[in-house]
């Protein structure tokens, strides 16, 4: 409210309706100094939402290159605004983006099975 964004930006807070929210987005903007592998970025790509990410998000997190633009925080507000404008003009098939995420090795079925196996192996060695 202080910044006068209430008509342009929605701050959801906690929600259990992430897929519905992602489907409604025009763009996903994620400025960050440093990240590991942010699930929200992966979910946005899987939903086919154009993403603008900081270079603080590792390239490993870019599963859908045609839907993602990365730039440094130091590029400034103008460069970020331009990147958001480009994201808003991107047109691609959301199903194609979801397929790209699966093909990149981030399918929940594959990663859940791998993680289960990893923990079971770890438990056996203890």
Which stretches of residues belong to each language-model region?
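Nucleotide-activated donor-binding/catalytic signature segment of Leloir-type glycosyltransferases, i.e.
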Residues: 1-13
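Short hydrophobic beta-strand element within catalytic cores of glycosyltransferases
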Residues: 50-55
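A charged, aromatic-enriched C-terminal amphipathic alpha-helix characteristic of glycosyltransferases
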Residues: 91-124
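Aromatic "clamp/platform" in nucleotide-sugar-dependent glycosyltransferases that forms part
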Residues: 14, 33
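Short alpha-helical segment that forms part of, or immediately flanks, the ligand-binding pocket
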Residues: 19, 38, 42-46
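An anion/phosphate-binding loop that grips the pyrophosphate of nucleotide cofactors and donors
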Residues: 25
């Amino acid at each position: 409210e202080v910044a006068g964004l209430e008509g342009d930006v929605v701050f959801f807070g906690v929600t259990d309706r992430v897929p519905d929210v992602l489907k409604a987005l025009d763009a996903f903007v994620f400025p960050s100094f440093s990240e590991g592998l942010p699930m929200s970025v992966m979910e946005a790509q899987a939903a086919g939402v154009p993403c603008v990410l900081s270079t603080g998000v590792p390239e490993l997190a870019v599963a859908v290159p045609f839907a993602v633009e990365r730039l440094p925080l130091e590029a400034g507000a103008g460069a970020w605004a331009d990147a958001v404008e480009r994201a808003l003009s991107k047109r691609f098939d959301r199903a194609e983006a979801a397929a790209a995420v699966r093909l990149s090795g981030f399918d929940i079925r594959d990663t859940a099975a791998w993680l289960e196996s990893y923990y079971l192996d770890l438990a056996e060695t203890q």
